[in-house]
Curated annotation (Swiss-Prot):
GO terms for molecular function: ATP binding; ATP hydrolysis activity; transmembrane transporter activity. Residues 13-233 form the ABC transporter domain. One of its GO terms (cellular component) is plasma membrane. This is Lipoprotein-releasing system ATP-binding protein LolD. PROSITE patterns: ABC_TRANSPORTER_1 (PS00211), ABC_TRANSPORTER_2 (PS50893), LOLD (PS51244).
Amino acid sequence: MEQQQGAEDVPVIYLHEIKRQYLQGEVPLTILDGAKLALWAGQSVALVAPSGSGKSTLLHIAGLLEAPDSGEVYVNGAPTSQLPDIERTQLRRTDIGFVYQSHRLLPEFSALENVMLPQMIRGLKKSESVKRAKEILGYLGLGDRITHRPAELSGGEQQRVAIARAVANAPRVLFADEPTGNLDPHTADHVFQALMQLVKATRVSMLIATHNMELAGRMDRRVSLSDGQVVELE
């Protein structure tokens, strides 16, 4: 399965001294305080931390969806803080994929059309988008469900379509925020297995926020957040 290639002597994503505060009423609340994290090509990393610790904020900043108050996000070794919005958007479309706890599929579109959409936005021909969408959905065991709309799919199938959509543009890194959080344990296990198989097949890097220590234990590294900083777990 096609996957973008790049230099492997620098991290795909590197967070350097990331700081982020929010206002709680009129009181500033520090979420991230000098956080550092390197994510290497083909590496899967679990971010395990309590609710409210800043997991989603870290993922959003790493994925260029949110700007830090200070610090720098490097993508493929290049700083991104001074990029124009249009270039940041283009970088998200080409190098970064997202999977959320809620699948966020477009209800009026079929599974195939949902996976085609990011490719069409990027400018790929329809025939190429159809071919790649079918390939990914087939790899995830959904080859016979491509014409079904989200409401006609089970929860696990919906999330697998969301995963297929996230990797449709062959990103270099995938961010997943509690991707199995809404699923029962059996379905969550199947979805997670499919996700890990796809990650290994494409050598995409992945940072996944999860409460599930058993699933986190299957990944290459485990990190947490403590006092606004990233710490490695055994």
